[in-house]
């Protein structure tokens, strides 16, 4: 979990420089699992809450995707 905390801090301080793989690790730690992929977009589902989030697979991720993830995990 320490690596996840470091990634969350990086997301807060530098939201424009995140890679999709890093965000996927954070989502996985909070109960999100890959639901499906269609083209360049991956959908992650939280089975406990039913929340569905879409992340575009581009490098680096746009700030809006990172901020959305932070809001959904409660950071």
Segments and roles (model prediction):
Residues 2-38, 47-75:
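Basic nucleic-acid-binding interfaces
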Residues 43-45:
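Short, conserved DNA-binding cores of transcription-related domains
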